[in-house]
Amino acid sequence: MSNIIKQLEQEQMKQDVPAFRPGDSVEVKVWVVEGSKKRLQAFERVVIAIRNRGLHSAFTVRKISNGEGVERVFQTHSPVIDSITVKRRGAVRKAKLYYLRERTGKAARIKERLNRVG
């Protein structure tokens, strides 16, 4: 029974999800329905948490909008998500960046992760 469920979940998982980690700045384009119109809406900022659960995986993105912190949880393999683009790699040492909720301005900055050559 569980093999059948795993196979069905594997078929529904998206294959084009880029590799990103907490601390990375990402742009998530989401389909939004307003009345009878359907359009793409971009949500861009820092990934503060990732929950890896196969088909049920999710990640949390936090941004500051008009001085207010806005967090949005996205299901990684949701059909509502059109694309995920990594804009900037962040160098952090924790898996969950919930401490950014209390920080604003320059205190909430994250160093950029540089890839080693060689």
UniProtKB/Swiss-Prot annotation:
SUPFAM superfamilies: Translation proteins SH3-like domain. One of its GO terms (cellular component) is cytosolic large ribosomal subunit. InterPro entries: Ribosomal_bL19, Ribosomal_bL19_CS, Ribosomal_bL19_sf, Translation_prot_SH3-like_sf. The keyword Transcription does not apply. GO terms for biological process: translation. GO terms for molecular function: structural constituent of ribosome. The keyword Ribosomal protein applies. It comes from the Bacteria. Pfam families: Ribosomal_L19 (PF01245). This protein is located at the 30S-50S ribosomal subunit interface and may play a role in the structure and function of the aminoacyl-tRNA binding site. Belongs to the bacterial ribosomal protein bL19 family. This is Large ribosomal subunit protein bL19. The lineage of its organism: Bacteria, Pseudomonadati, Pseudomonadota, Gammaproteobacteria, Enterobacterales. The gene is rplS.
